[in-house]
């Protein structure tokens, strides 16, 4: 596959340049969503807030450069890019700590495998790498446990593609991948088992825009708002023990969102009855729960960690090919 070959060549080239380095690396895939941060094993809210005094409790608390931060509370506001402030850097440290704890490590050489929307990949890739590698050696504490990491390098992969990389070899002649994330919807056709980059589309109309519409209608009709966590719960399970009037508004807005997604797919020339379509990302469960299409050609990958797993898989493949990883 052309796209995968290109990614692997980048890692092979770096392998020749750094052939003297220690091969023992901890590859950590991280999906930096605007709503949720994901690794191959962890999911937490994309929230970080400075604590101005020494905390009484250290659960989900990051200590970095003499400051304390609460991780995973209220979602960050969406910005034009992910490198405008230190929020995603701090969230990356938290994600690394969570993964290292799972692996029983406090010190490690880390190779970060991350992603960006396919159509913004070229424009934002270098800035994202510089942002994540601005400090080669990092000392910090998470939940009052000390960590020392050396960030060896960063590989950036296209999201959406990463979510299905393990399934591409078994795909039909033409398959459409629709990755519904927090802020964007990526539409990627795979033709003869290779992504057609010329027809990839990124739409800035993900789940956060749906939740905003829900609360706008709740305020307009009932003069009250619903917590995003409650809305996400309804998206995930299709039900909730809340007031019927609010529930009706939420369901109506979600159904409208789903229909707009299908309309976008139609507008780009795909037949909803014949084109094999795979929904991935956090919105896959929304399409499954609230969509009106129950066709054999439509399937759903409900694993919200699929992109993070794909990033880690792609990076591991490249590093092994470059003999930088045993």
Indicate where each model-derived feature is located.
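Cysteine/selenocysteine-centered motifs that mediate thiol-based redox chemistry or coordinate metal-sulfur cofactors
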Residues: 225
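Nucleotide/phosphate-binding catalytic cleft detector across ATP-hydrolyzing
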Residues: 1-177, 194-209, 221, 229-326
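PRPP/pyrophosphate-binding module of the type I phosphoribosyltransferase fold
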Residues: 187-192
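Ser/Thr-glycine-rich phosphate-binding loops at phosphate-binding pockets of nucleotides
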Residues: 180-186
